[in-house]
């Protein structure tokens, strides 16, 4: 049995929901509410000491870190649903290189406009002492919250994140223009699924212009959005808007 502890709007949770949908695997839903601090409760920290989402529990055993979870699902169910890793070693290496890049570049980069556009209002409503207590309770990313400060990320960090996101969409555009319709070969893979939530979030926070001049990237995004797994991962309440 698969149980997924996740947050509706979390990009890392969306990655795993996409993979579960593509694999056709049923799962028990355990939504985590950040506003209530449910990710920092002793019960949740016993499953995931990092205090982040998602966490997959498979037959009672927790698996943490979204990309690790996605690889785990493919490893234990390679012939169930869509195959998400190539069969050859070189193909798998290409996918893993993309996964490393996604973790290091677009995933942290998209947090900057996400936090500035979506979470700053609530963060400002907290007192300095409340913010300090929250940061102290957070096992990971203390530096991230301290840089966020009380006024959001400064312009130089916003500009840097935008440059990193532009690099990401240029790499997607180049990959699908040169080799195949997909990022790492002739078939969809974890590379496509794991970068998609960052692109969706860019759209949600008004950054679609970053890739509007990239036709192959635009086509890739349209094809990804048309897959049945998209609506299963990005259901009502899981998308955000700077107007919310």
Feature names for model-found ranges:
Residues 1-139, 178:
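GST-like domain detector, emphasizing the conserved glutathione-binding G-site
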Residues 7, 33, 190, 237-238:
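Short, solvent-exposed turn/loop segments enriched in Gly/Ser/Thr/Pro and often Arg
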Residues 10, 192, 227:
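Conserved G/P- and acidic residue-centered "switch" motifs that form tight phosphate/ATP-binding loops
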Residues 21, 203, 226:
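Short polybasic/polar patches that bind polyanions
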Residues 46, 86, 226, 235-236:
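Phosphate-coordinating loops and pocket residues in cytosolic domains that bind phosphorylated ligands
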Residues 106-222:
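GST-like fold's C-terminal all-alpha helical module
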Residues 214, 227-228:
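Acidic-histidine catalytic/liganding microenvironments
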Residues 233-244:
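Terminal-tail/helix-coil boundary detector
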């Amino acid at each position: 049995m698969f149980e997924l502890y996740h947050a509706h709007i979390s990009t890392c949770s969306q990655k795993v929901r996409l993979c579960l949908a593509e694999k056709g695997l049923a799962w028990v839903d355990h939504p985590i509410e950040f506003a209530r601090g449910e990710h920092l409760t002793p019960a949740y920290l016993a499953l995931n000491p990092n205090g982040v989402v998602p966490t997959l529990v498979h037959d009672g055993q927790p698996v943490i870190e979204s990309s690790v979870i996605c690889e785990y699902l493919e490893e234990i169910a390679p012939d169930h649903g869509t195959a998400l890793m190539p069969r050859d070693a070189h193909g798998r290496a290409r996918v893993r290189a993309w996964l490393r890049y996604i973790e290091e570049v677009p995933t942290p980069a998209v947090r900057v406009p996400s936090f500035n556009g979506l979470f700053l209002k609530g963060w400002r409503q907290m007192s300095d002492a409340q913010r300090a207590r929250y940061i102290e309770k957070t096992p990971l990313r203390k530096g991230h919250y301290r840089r966020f400060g009380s006024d959001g990320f400064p312009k130089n960090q916003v500009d840097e994140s935008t440059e990193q996101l532009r690099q990401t969409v240029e790499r997607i555009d180049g990959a699908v223009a040169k080799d195949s319709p997909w990022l790492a070969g002739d078939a969809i893979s974890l590379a496509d699924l794991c970068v998609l939530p960052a692109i969706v979030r860019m759209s949600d926070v008004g950054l679609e212009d970053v890739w509007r001049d990239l036709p192959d990237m635009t086509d890739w995004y349209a094809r990804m959005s048309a897959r049945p797994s998209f609506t299963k991962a990005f259901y009502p309440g899981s998308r955000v808007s700077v107007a919310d």
